[in-house]
Amino acid sequence: MAAITASMVAELRAKTDAPMMECKKALTEADGDLNKAEELLRVKLGNKASKAASRVTAEGVVAAFIDGTTGALVELNCETDFVSKNDDFLAFSAKVAELVAKQNPADVAALSALEIDGVSVEATRTALIGKIGENMTIRRFARYANGGKLVSYLHGTRIGVMVEFDGDEAAAKDVAMHVAAMKPVSLSAEQVPADLIAKERSIAEQKAAESGKPAEIAAKMVEGSVQKYLKEVSLFNQPFVKNDKQTVEQMLKAANTTVKSFTLYVVGEGIEKKQDDFAAEVAAQVAAAQKG
């Protein structure tokens, strides 16, 4: 049985808004697995438990570059919020985004071998680490060069969106802002990844089973929950953030605009922040001193 620490309970509470005791019970049942505990709470408390599922812990920036119909969106990570605002780090991020758009590297390793002002990206990164005194990495990038129109939207430097479209640029820009705010996972319900659907279905089945309803009604509850989820996470089905009386699809149709694809990056999304156990560290130091 894994030890359930106060910091684990606090982290789960921050993610879910669930009562402390419920968080502790869920962690105990999940044997200390935070992700599993969050799922258990979602089953018990409903979707409120997922309100902060996208809250991130790692620091860094998202940078964008567009030149005509070619563009790139990149995420670079660092250790602290302070460094994410550093001028040298921001300038490096902007140059990396431009390099991705113009040179079309296959992956981060290939990107690292390209040059900025005659010096490799990797050497530039290493020099910047030495100058600033903090580790930083190029995490991911998306490149567009399909001949379609492009717009980007940056919410500060922590959320970045690129949209490929045909039609009205103002409408496409509105879609980019909408994506940053509502965080859809796909264009349409049909494109939602199967693993996400399976996860939602599993949660819905557990909730339906606990409801004690007859099998036929429970099955309808499950299907209803899944369909509701698909509408909530697919861009075209979402209520438009600037006018919730119409869906994004309806807004685009009225503007005679087609969105072909989009990329959304949220800084640190999916990265677990290291939690220091100072009590254990002190105990280890004391033990080492006693041995000495």
From Swiss-Prot:
UniProt-annotated location(s): Cytoplasm
Main location: cytoplasm
Stretches the record annotates as Involved in Mg(2+) ion dislocation from EF-Tu: 80-83
A GO-annotated cellular component: cytoplasm
Gene3D superfamilies assigned: 1.10.286.20, DNA helicase RuvA subunit, C-terminal domain, Elongation factor Ts, dimerisation domain
GO molecular function, a single term: translation elongation factor activity
UniProt keywords, alphabetically: Cytoplasm, Elongation factor, Protein biosynthesis
Pfam family, one: EF_TS
Function: Associates with the EF-Tu.GDP complex and induces the exchange of GDP to GTP. It remains bound to the aminoacyl-tRNA.EF-Tu.GTP complex up to the GTP hydrolysis stage on the ribosome.
Family label: Belongs to the EF-Ts family.
Protein known as: Elongation factor Ts
Species: Cupriavidus taiwanensis (strain DSM 17343 / BCRC 17206 / CCUG 44338 / CIP 107171 / LMG 19424 / R1) (Ralstonia taiwanensis (strain LMG 19424))
Taxonomic path: Bacteria, Pseudomonadati, Pseudomonadota, Betaproteobacteria, Burkholderiales
